[in-house]
Amino acid sequence: MDNKHLIKDIATTFGAVIESIKDVDENSFNKIPFENSWTIGQVTEHIVICSGGVQDNKTGDAGRACDENLDQLRAIFLNMEEKSKASPQVTPRQPPHPKNGLIDQLERNKNHLLSIAMERDLEKLSLDMEFPYMGYLTRYEWLSFICLHTQRHLNQIRNIQQQL
């Protein structure tokens, strides 16, 4: 486990999302690029919803390496050929979306995640919520998931930009 690498990943990933959307005009930000696609604003809102923190009010000892599930998470979220539908609780609302407000929220989420990575014991198992098909994840794995999930949607944003 490498906290410095994770901290760098969080900062770099969220910085890349912000960079990719900051110069997009409001019309393009909220334009549906093709049928059954989200807008850049919807993808950004989805990232914001999914990156608000780690469910870790109740924790315990993992009894395993804190990054044991990392390869499986990478295989799931970095495979761009696999598509899945977002669950209702993380589905963004319909456009329009306020670009600057979402950028501000991305920045707040990034800072919150960085504080978790720097200040908390990442080896602890988060017992508040199970990850589908994997069970409980450590804080390290949850933060890694958030990065991988965000990277996946950064790719989606870039693909949408090419269609506009």
Q: Model segments located where?
A:
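Short, contiguous alpha-helical
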Residues: 31-78, 123-164
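Short, helix-capping/interhelical loops that line the mouth of catalytic, cofactor-
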Residues: 1-5, 53-105
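Hydrophobic/aromatic residues within well-ordered alpha-helical segments
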Residues: 10-13, 47, 109, 149
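Charge-rich, low-complexity N-terminal segments
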Residues: 2, 6-9, 13-39
